[in-house]
Amino acid sequence: MSPSTETEMEDTKPSVVENGDQAVSRFAEFSKNELALDEKSCKEAMDLFGETKHLLMANVSSMGNGTIEEAERYWFAFILYSIKRLTQKNEESEKEEIENTGLTLCRILRAAKLNIADFFKELPQFVVKAGPILSNRFGSDWENKLEAKEMHANTIHLKILSKYYKRVFEEFFVSTDANVENESSVTGRVSECHRFGWLLFLALRVHAFSRFKDLVTCTNGLISIMAILIIHVPARFRNFNIQDSARFVKKSSKGVDLLASLCNIYNTSEDELRKTMEQANNLVADILKKTPCLASECETENLEDFDKDGLTYFKDLMEESSLASSLNILENDYDQMTRNKGELDERLFINEDDSLLASGSLSGGSSVSAGGVKRKYDLMMSPSKTIISPLSPQRSPASHANGIPGSTNSKIAATPVSTAMTTAKWLRTVISPLPSKPSQELERFLTSCDRDITSEVVRRAQIILQAIFPSSPLGDRCVTGSLQSANLMDNIWAEQRRLEAMKLYYRLLATMCRAEAQILGNNLTSLLTNERFHRCMLACSAELVLATHKTVTMLFPAVLERTGITAFDLSKVIESFIRYEESLPRELRRHLNSLEERLLESLVWEKGSSMYNSLAVARPALSAEINRLSMLAEPMPSLDEIAMHINFSCGGLPPVPSLPKPETLPAQNGDMRSPKRLCTENRNVLAERNSFTSPVKDRLLHLSNLKSKLLPPPLQSAFASPTKPNPGGGGETCAETGISVFFSKIVKLGAVRISGMVERLQLSQQTRENVYSLFQRILNQRTSLFFNRHIDQIILCCFYGVAKISQLNLTFREIIYNYRKQPQCKPQVFRSVFVDWSPARRNGGARHRTGQEHIDIISFYNEVFIPSVKPLLVELGPGGATVRSDQVPEANSKTDGHLVQNPGSPRISPFPSLPDMSPKKVSAAHNVYVSPLRSSKMDALISHSSKSYYACVGESTHAYQSPSKDLTAINNRLNSNRKVRGPLKFDDVDVGLVSDSMVANSLYLQNGSSASSSGAPLKSEQPDS
């Protein structure tokens, strides 16, 4: 391999000729002239900019379009946003706080000519680069004070809620978009009513909810506002008939039950809706000074044919004479409540044309949509289409999930809001009715241990769930008048979520005990007395509850931090959750699958992961490097320590000393090095939970039934001490078995991502084999390259290394450009790669640097990757031995210290056979599945013997016309009365439907039995809300 092959790469960084001092001058002018900052704030901003200007100059090319002008605008906004958020948290003088009034994020963005999507897309890079400086200036908890992730998630919530509100509003009232000239006065009034509803909703958020409330609660709030509008907006503006039996299905002799009908349409809880509507009514009375009266005592056209029991009516609330003044009052109230918080003005979301809501670009500034222009919603959801989205629409639309039954809207695809409400309904109807204590079956398992551990299990659940869903001190933030404390509402919310998580935990624990008993017998002492196992179960239960409600303030990995476990611990129970909870909605199954993928790609490799404790035992040759980098997990905090940090305001917990410390429990995890994630350095960069983005639709770990039909290894071995012999025999320790399973998952994930990039880059199958072989060898022989990094960083380098050694015409720029189009892409993957320049790791390309830092992926490739993997690359080159992956021996004796494969290592294997299709069942009534089709399978599927089983767009039975026409033809054939091969009787109710698992398994068997699903999703543009 020639030196030029090793390190000569295209330079993607333009030279920065701008002097840092000139940037300082421009920033000073921007702060004073554009934003009119007061002297104190301006000085603070100038000081922070001066400290970080070298970072700006070094990262110009990686921000926005790569020009100095745009990079400066981003950096100006980041600095001012940080100053506003972090200094106001430290202000003790109310006078000083008021002096800085008016510097909101909206003002900053407008002055910098940036939109919201682009700002939050680039902000993580600033957080990584400037993190140490911000920590020195504002304290180690600066990131919690900044609340950047919460603000971003909150922004996405508001975006989809505003679209949802507009759609629902227009289902009941005339459209606000009408352009007919003679209807301008009508649409003007309706538009005012529409704005009134949104302002009342924001008042509800400000006064009654937390600042960052979950999506389900906010949706309940919007539906309660809609109920108020329905009975107050003048009847002449209605777009519905009260006698519409398909819309208002809940009726009695007294008339239509409005709230029950709305709950039926939008899957909301009637109890929660009534409580929220009562809060909204109180707001109308207290803020707008309107006098409430019982609807049953009012005679008005608006209430005709409604059941008036339980409804409150305000005379003249929406009449023209008072509407304008009410709007002004609500506007002023919002200004007063939010004017000094430095946040976004949430009123702007009602105006879709606002420049701040303009579409941002995907993944670093380049448009990547191959199918046309993406909608604003898609781009607001995330700067990059990542895998971690609890807001992704369901694949199979519910019959009435997103519209009024029987109306034209009832068949459209599920939206983030309707999906959230459907999933919340599962939690409400399936989990909430369960008892909040162990069932009799579970108690039998708990009492059959060497000692009765029932009380320990109950107490642990209370402590851990109290830590995850803490109660706020009462009266901490009360509002004036008769309105309730927002923190009182938070406490009620937290108690409800604790109960849901506890009931789910007990339910799953009983199911898992039943399954483990089939393997180990009825005595499950070793598993049920394992502290880490229970905390993982509780964390996973809580995460499902949080994902169901789309909670903004508890973004993953918060549950790990609050329970004292790590990503590696949690990854051991995810598959069991999916396997054993059969009622789990598809959305939550997908959430767990994508969560596992996220754990594998980066979180498990972070500093402080318990994976390193096992790896040091399974791979002794790596222990020195693990210890040098301080990668080992710290001891898991005891329940006593966690309990000390909790305010047990609800009481009912036994005294703390009654429970022995985890270190003394008989079946603990050996050395108790079960971790608490203390490493905050860069922990949120590559693994940030952008929980509201479009997901990789079940690309990996797609369906649990695609995995081996053999019984999984007992859970107790997964949670046993790393040095303990594996009960399954074979002479392995539990650490070796665990690392072997973990590495096999990494290899499968790598195979899926490599395959996706190969197809996108249109490379040969031999190149795919070489990249995959190199990736496996690095994992097994240069494992430390993965430490503190994202596996995609290694994959991208593998592609370029193989391209150079194979003399392919492929630049790193092309690789990164195409990687941006991958659904899991995050810009930080190629912009910020961890490196350690200590003498033990220094090589010829390190330029005598010292310490640790984050560099771009090209620098990482040249200075770290190539010096380490050069011998492995040489083997793949035309001048080398060209070793095929299936010919590599299990043990390699090369002298790197990391090269010898250990018993815990997976064997280097040829590229696995991955299922090509990820079927989507498109109808609950018909056995019809739709799946993307790879060109490699086209010939086989449309051969003479099999083509009748498939309908392929453009290639089925006639020449390609267009997707629309081909799909129409397919639909016509499916819906025709012509009998196709007798057994396929879609309209016969007695014919059993083919299950999703049967389809998945058939694909699995066709494509081999050793891989997980890659399942490229069927591409479709998602709805706006």
UniProtKB/Swiss-Prot annotation:
Location relative to the cell: Nucleus
GO BP, one annotated term: regulation of transcription by RNA polymerase II
One Pfam family recorded for the sequence: RB_A
SMART domains from the UniProt entry: CYCLIN, DUF3452, RB_A
UniProt keyword annotations, A-Z: Cell cycle, Nucleus, Repressor, Transcription, Transcription regulation
S-S bonds: none
Annotated region (Spacer), positions in chain: 616-736
Region of interest: Pocket: 415-871
GO MF terms, alphabetically ordered: RNA polymerase II transcription regulatory region sequence-specific DNA binding
Region listing for Disordered, in residue ranges: 388-411, 885-912, 1006-1025
Domain B: region residues: 737-871
A GO term from the CC aspect: nucleus
InterPro entries xrefs: Cyclin-like_dom, Cyclin-like_sf, RB_A, RB_B, RB_fam, RB_N
Region spans: Domain A: 415-615
PANTHER family linked to this entry: RE32990P-RELATED, RETINOBLASTOMA-ASSOCIATED PROTEIN RB -RELATED
Family stated for the protein in its record: Belongs to the retinoblastoma protein (RB) family.
Functional description taken from the UniProt entry: Regulator of biological processes that recruits a histone deacetylase to control gene transcription. May play a role in the entry into mitosis, negatively regulating the cell proliferation. Formation of stable complexes with geminiviridae replication-associated proteins may create a cellular environment which favors viral DNA replication.
The protein's name: Retinoblastoma-related protein
Native source organism of the sequence: Medicago sativa (Alfalfa)
Lineage: Eukaryota, Viridiplantae, Streptophyta, Embryophyta, Tracheophyta
